[in-house]
Amino acid sequence: MATYEVESIATVVGGHTRVQDDYQGGVESIIRLNDAYPLETLQGIEEFSHLTVTWRFHLARPEDVELHARSPRGNPRWPATGTFVHRNHRRPNQLATSYPRLLRVEGRDLLVTDLDAVDGTPVIDLAPYFEEMGPRSAVRQPAWPSEMLGRYWLDASGRP
């Protein structure tokens, strides 16, 4: 098995302060580019409405990884599915990809909304979202993800 060493290119500043399954919407945060990268690496990004952001579940522990089928969120109404069918910190590399909306760029700071990472999260990579690189046909999925994520993007101000 190959091993890769990666360094974060940016850090999430502000936004969500705790991990929570739902109510991720409407929260603004900053993706702050590390000083090691010249500002020129962001040139032109302000012309895009959305970003593709790969980040690490930095609050997760190695022992959180689960390499077996289980019901999403522990809900027995949903079918047991394998590790690579889940989008959470229990994956082997504890990485996630999100598609926040880019509001503006201020120097090293990319102000975004709807980034479901918490303050202090290391960003491994970022790129503009190209519509042409999204799914090329209709998306098919079982019913449980829509049921499970029905409240995911509700406004965070409505959190119980």
Model-derived regions: residue spans:
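Glycine-rich, low-complexity intrinsically disordered segments
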Residues: 1-99, 103-160
